Amino acid sequence: MTKTLYYRKLGRTSAHRQALLRNLVTSLVKHESIQTTWAKAKEAQRFAEKLITMAKRANPQNNRKGLAEGMVFEKETTLKKVFDVLVPRYNGRRCGYTRLLKLPPRSTDNAPMGVLEFVDGPKDIRFHMTAKTVGICLAQQKALTPITRKNIHKVLLFRKNGKAEFDQLVQKEKESEHARLKEDHEDEKTVKKDWKRGDPIPRPTYI
């Protein structure tokens, strides 16, 4: 009879696995974004979600804060940030405090890699990439795709003061794209070419 595997063992003993996850979550709280293998990131994501949920439900009548202390290292600094920064940030969210994105495989052993981050934070990749996409589309006078509009709604739904920060990033990317387009246009004018964009590629004479 096959056994159901409810979690990844990560090739370690129980104590070593627990210490690894505590270390990953501590680094995640400290830096708000970490890169590791996909399997470790998936397990650390579950650990981090439990930590935030436990911190949100902590009160003097229960032992949730004591349980949260056992999930991280450097308790004084880590838990201070959890309760002072992360819990107020996610008061409006019931779940989904982290996001896991795929990265190219590691060059040395081709291991699947990923980046684990807290959403609505200063290192939110989707927030910055969506703002960059909108800025480029506005500079090139292109319509926003349905996926981009959906991402705008997602990244601004729970983010405090997100609209002002998003508009600032969009304007910055728009100006950067305008400068790039202007530079490309100047290069096309200065370089002498006996062909123009859209002309068919000439075939070699020996064919």
Swiss-Prot record:
Pfam families: Ribosomal_L17. Coiled coil: none annotated. The keyword Nucleotide-binding does not apply. Residues 173-207 are annotated as: Disordered. It is found in: Mitochondrion. One of its GO terms (biological process) is mitochondrial translation. InterPro entries: Ribosomal_bL17, Ribosomal_bL17_CS, Ribosomal_bL17_sf. Residues 173-200 have a biased composition (Basic and acidic residues). GO terms for molecular function: structural constituent of ribosome. Keywords: Mitochondrion, Ribonucleoprotein, Ribosomal protein. GO terms for cellular component: mitochondrial large ribosomal subunit; mitochondrion. Belongs to the bacterial ribosomal protein bL17 family. Component of the mitochondrial ribosome (mitoribosome), a dedicated translation machinery responsible for the synthesis of mitochondrial genome-encoded proteins, including at least some of the essential transmembrane subunits of the mitochondrial respiratory chain. The mitoribosomes are attached to the mitochondrial inner membrane and translation products are cotranslationally integrated into the membrane. Component of the mitochondrial large ribosomal subunit (mt-LSU). Mature yeast 74S mitochondrial ribosomes consist of a small (37S) and a large (54S) subunit. The 37S small subunit contains a 15S ribosomal RNA (15S mt-rRNA) and at least 32 different proteins. The 54S large subunit contains a 21S rRNA (21S mt-rRNA) and at least 45 different proteins. This is Large ribosomal subunit protein bL17m. It comes from Schizosaccharomyces pombe (strain 972 / ATCC 24843) (Fission yeast). The gene is mrpl8.
